[in-house]
């Protein structure tokens, strides 16, 4: 049910065509993968010694406005979305290079509201989003190292690559136009360049999200989405070996959707800016906090986001 508190839309089969434009637009918001192109991830390719296990807990709170394509009769739309995720990462060696593999599982709570043809309407969701599997390897500048060798390592110029896969395992119900799972596969290859000089670190990343079709969208329709290209830039200052602060920015474009053969005017050209702070207490415990906001938004979520995370690391 969509906007269930007013009963405006009770069954997917009865929805007029433009409602599916609303559904396609909202589908960009609640899903954890939808926010993936918006990510700001400083330090993603910084090397670690092999044989380290890292357990991570992250809570992010997002709130703001929603921009729809002009033909959608929704005004004053805004949302609050809270995502709590648990993740596990293992560092290792691949062909003599430092690398890592990871798994992440998100739980999402979302509330959306706005004016549909002048009537105040609301929607709530709670459940599991699509998980993510990832693998990353430093192709240049960071060979695989044991902890003793890593203690004397100094980062200079790195080139890394990663692959993230989100299988369609999140909560999904084809009788609802808005779901937490995507009912499709999402894959993101990415390249990253890191250069460190003294206390400063500059990072540039470029990737693209690729999507399979959702063949059971909103009552059995097929929803296609074009790739979303994303770039990130980060400038980090290291106050001490375990404490750093980064300025973050990104830009992402693409993602136009087609539902039942009808193209929507929802091409995204959006960007975000923010800042990230990281503090490691010792070799086992570290904390990270970040804040970001939309700098330019055409279609989708113009959100402010605040996140806090905790990492626990151990060997073998």
Predicted regions and their residues:
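Residues that define the transmembrane beta-barrel architecture of outer-membrane proteins
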Residues: 51, 78-86, 126-133, 157, ...
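Transmembrane beta-strands of outer-membrane beta-barrel proteins
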Residues: 53-55, 99-103, 133, 157-163, ...
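Residues on the lipid-exposed face of transmembrane beta-strands in outer-membrane beta-barrel proteins
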Residues: 57-59, 86-90, 133-139, 163, ...
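Transmembrane beta-strands of outer-membrane beta-barrel pores
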Residues: 59-65, 105-111, 139, 165-171, ...
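Surface-exposed strand-loop-strand hairpins of Gram-negative outer-membrane beta-barrel proteins
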Residues: 62-83, 121, 174-179
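Repeated loop/turn-to-beta-strand initiation elements of outer-membrane beta-barrel proteins
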Residues: 64-66, 96-99, 143, 199-202, ...
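Outer-membrane pore/translocation modules
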Residues: 109-224, 266
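Outer membrane beta-barrel transmembrane domains
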Residues: 218-316
């Amino acid at each position: 049910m969509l906007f269930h508190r007013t009963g405006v839309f009770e069954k997917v089969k009865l929805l007029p065509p433009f409602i599916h434009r609303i559904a396609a637009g909202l589908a960009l918001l609640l899903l954890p993968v939808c926010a993936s192109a918006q990510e700001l991830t400083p330090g993603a390719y910084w090397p670690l010694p092999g044989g380290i296990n890292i357990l991570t807990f992250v809570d992010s709170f997002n709130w703001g406005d929603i921009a729809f394509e002009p033909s959608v009769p929704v005004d004053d739309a805004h949302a609050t979305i809270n995502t709590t995720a648990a993740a596990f990462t293992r560092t290792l060696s691949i062909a003599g290079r430092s690398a890592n593999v990871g798994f992440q599982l998100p739980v999402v709570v979302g509330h959306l509201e706005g004016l549909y043809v002048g009537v105040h309407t609301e929607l709530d969701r709670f459940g599991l989003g699509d998980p993510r599997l990832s693998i990353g390897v430093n192709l240049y500048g960071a060979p695989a190292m044991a902890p003793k060798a890593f203690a004397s390592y100094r980062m200079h110029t790195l080139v890394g690559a990663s692959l993230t896969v989100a299988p369609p395992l999140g909560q999904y119900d084809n009788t609802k136009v808005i779901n937490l799972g995507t009912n499709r596969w999402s894959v993101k290859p990415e390249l990253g360049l890191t250069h460190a000089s003294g206390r400063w670190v500059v990072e540039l990343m470029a990737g693209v999200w690729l999507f399979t079709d959702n063949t059971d969208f909103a009552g059995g329709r097929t929803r296609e989405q074009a790739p979303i290209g994303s770039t990130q830039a980060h400038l980090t200052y290291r106050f001490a070996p375990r404490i750093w602060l980064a300025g973050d920015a990104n830009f992402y474009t693409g993602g136009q959707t087609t539902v039942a053969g009808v193209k929507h005017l929802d091409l995204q050209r959006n960007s975000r800016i923010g800042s990230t702070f990281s503090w490691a207490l010792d070799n086992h415990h570290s904390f990270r906090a970040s804040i970001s906001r939309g700098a330019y938004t055409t279609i989708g979520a113009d959100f402010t986001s605040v996140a806090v995370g905790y990492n626990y690391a151990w060997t073998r």
